[in-house]
Amino acid sequence: HQWITEGARYEKHWAFTAPSKSAPPKGSLWGRNPIDLFIEARLLAEGLKPQQRATTVKRLRRVSMDLSGLPPNIKELDSFLDDSSPNVYERFVDRLLASPRYGERMATWWLDSARYGDSHGYDNDLENAQWPWRNWVLEAFNSNMPYDRFTMEQLAGDLLPNARHDQILATGFNRNHRIQTEGGAIDEEW
């Protein structure tokens, strides 16, 4: 730290700087919300133009793939195209968000990051009975559980006052790793 005591200048790390809200750029050719205005301004500054608006079927396919991992079926497409009400798109998205497929799709990212697997993933590769925790994650996404609660219950759900069974189950996250049983199993770990 000698360089500091000798008067060296340094900037505070960006992570310790409070974010400030920027006013959206003025004027718009196509933007419908503040994020669009920022994107439009940057595109114009770079001499670029946005892609043309996607067709209705492409938009439905994109949002369906994003939220459920599956394309819309023919019945869903026909129902959408036959509906002329002004909020048909919003209702389509709401149905996707209310579907169990939404939780499955969103949970995939978390399960992959947490290295979930149905086996121990080691040389003997035995079954790993972590599916109750996997199902808890799916339900957490489908019930729109707040992120702070989602992480707290996985890290320390068993330590919460009057912990419910599902909160204890959430701590399966802490056992979600490779396991080998060469030296036998320790009962307290299970």
Located regions from the model:
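Short, structured secondary-structure elements
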Residues: 2-190
